[in-house]
Every structure is written in structure tokens, then in C-alpha cells.
Amino acid sequence: GGGAFFDQGLPMVDLAMWLADFPAPLRVWAHMDRPRGTAVEESALVTLECESGIAFTFDISWAYVGYEERWWFETLSSRGSARLAPLRVVKELNGKPTDVSPGGAATRENSFNQSYRAELAHFLSVVREETPYEAPSDQVILHKVIEAAYKSADEGKEVKL
């Protein structure tokens, strides 16, 4: 198995790359903390730079010491920002930051569970040939980034892709 980055970071890198429409990765820099006597990392800090000036930073840890567990995903741009857990969207309107978070009808099922239900429905639709199969080219890019992050951490330097 992998450490914290492979376990928790891979889905975050996948989400970030997907939201950005899988831009071509250019370079990766990573630092991973592997306590003595262990083969896997407890924490990782990874920076990924892609084409078009898009950059991502991932801070992943199994060893967070604090009062409560923290998880968030945030995207920033010159026109606004968005954050998950809970969803919050801020956009500049009339020169001021304005909360434009979508409100919706409350449901009995949370968004996390809804996402799994949607993923399963999509999978079944592909198996039944109701939806075209998508080639895994995005996942090949994702795994090249993950591999480059581990190589960067091992060698202590940036890895160009």
C-alpha cells in the first residue's frame, strides 16, 4: 500500500486536475515525511505546476495534531474562489467579494453519498452501453503526476514531466 499521499492525496490531485480539465503537467515538487523505520509517508506537501499557469498545492497528513480533523478543498482565481466542505463560492461583484454559494433544497442524503450514487449510476450506464466508455487517458496523466511526486520526494528536487 501507499502512505498518506497515495491514500488521501491521489483523490485530491484527481479532483483538482478534473476541475481544471486535466491541463498538461509541467513539473512537480514534493516533500514527504517518512518516520524512521517506516516505508510510507505520514505527510506530504506537493506542488504541481501545469500549462496555462495553473498551479496546485496539496498538503496531506495522517499525523495532524490538533483539536479536530480538518479536510478542505479550495480553488482560487483572479475572479473568485470556491471551497468544499461545506460548499462556498465567492465572486467579485461591483468591486466587492460576494458570497454566491448555491442554495438548494435540503435533501435527506448528503452530497458525499449522492456523489457515490451518481458514480454507480454512471458505471451501470456504461456497462449497459447506454453511455459511451471514456478512455482512461486522464488517469494516465494522474498516475504520472503521482509517480513524479514520489520521485521528487525521494530525490529532493523538482521533477519535470
Question: Where are the regions that the model predicts?
Answer:
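Rossmann-like dinucleotide-binding domain that binds NAD(P)(H)
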Residues: 1-55, 61-66, 70
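Beta-strand scaffold of nucleotide-dependent catalytic cores
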Residues: 57-60, 84-86
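C-terminal helix-rich "cap/oligomerization" subdomain common to oxidoreductases
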Residues: 51, 122-161
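C-terminal substrate-binding/catalytic lobe of Rossmann-fold NAD(P)-dependent oxidoreductases
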Residues: 49, 66-70, 76-86, 117-118
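A general structural signal for well-ordered alpha-helical segments in protein cores
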Residues: 12-13, 117-121, 146-147
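Short polybasic amphipathic segments
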Residues: 73, 87-100
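Active-site loop of classical SDR/Rossmann-like NAD(P)-dependent oxidoreductases
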Residues: 107-121
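Short acidic/polar mixed-charge low-complexity motifs
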Residues: 24, 52-54, 78-81, 157
